[in-house]
Amino acid sequence: MSLLYIFAASPMEGEPVRKIAEVADSRSPARCGANDVFFIVSGMGPRNARKRAEEVLGVRTEPSVSLKPDSVLVIGLCGGLTESLPEGRVVAYTACKSTEAAKPMLSCSPTAVDQVVTLLVSSGVACDRAIGITSPRIATNRQERLALAESGAAVVDMESYSILETAATAGVPVAVLRVVADSLDRVLPNLNRALDNAGGLDSRKALRVALGSPVRTARLLTANKRAMQHLTKALEIILKAPCFV
């Protein structure tokens, strides 16, 4: 039995975990097949994710959860940076970079990645290995995504690197499983205008952006919903399996 901490940026991205593991009490782990799991909402953006991971894993402070995990799993949505990754494709990170040039690339657990990818593919779920990059800003169009792709990354998110970095300090291996919600050519509403100082969304500003771009916002929400269906299917398979021993 492995103890697994699962991080997602938002309750929406973590909803599959709540359903699969029947998470009811955040103070105690939920049994899920071969794993006991804690679900943690990190918040959106690198700063929020780092702060929450440090709290939970006991880096710089006493841990908010008393049990040290065997592994950490980061889940959620990501943006595709290459033509080869369509919307709805599940990706397992082999490593993650930061848009901060001085920071080194961090590797995910090779054992967990191999087990997750092998299990998903054998179960009929397409899952690509990919290098991710974490950015404090939302990549809203092809030009911005191609600029990020120059780093060698194939997908972008806003939290994974911060959690990987913190977990490395705590001596805990990490796997990252995300799903492509917006492909290389999708144009998103400019929600960067709604980001607060910590990198999260200011709800009032986000509403104004949405009202100013109603069609793009509707398409974004629809794409996110479709992507989460693919991620849910993948999580239903791996969360009950011994992938994180």
Where are each of the predicted segments found?
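Predominant activation on well-ordered alpha-helical scaffold segments within soluble catalytic domains
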Residues: 18, 50, 54, 117, ...
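Active-site rim beta-loop-alpha module in soluble metabolic enzymes
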Residues: 108-189
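Short, surface-exposed, charged loop/turn segments at secondary-structure junctions
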Residues: 86-96, 144-150, 190-196
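Metabolite-binding pocket within alpha/beta catalytic cores that recognizes anionic/polar moieties
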Residues: 1-124, 154, 169
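Regulatory input/activation interfaces that engage signals or partners
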Residues: 180-245
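Exposed alpha-helical structural elements
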Residues: 16, 115, 143, 147, ...
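Glycine-rich anion-binding loop/nest that anchors nucleotide
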Residues: 8, 72-76, 160, 175-183, ...
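Conserved active-site and cofactor/substrate-binding residues in soluble primary-metabolism enzymes
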Residues: 9-12, 44-51, 111, 143, ...
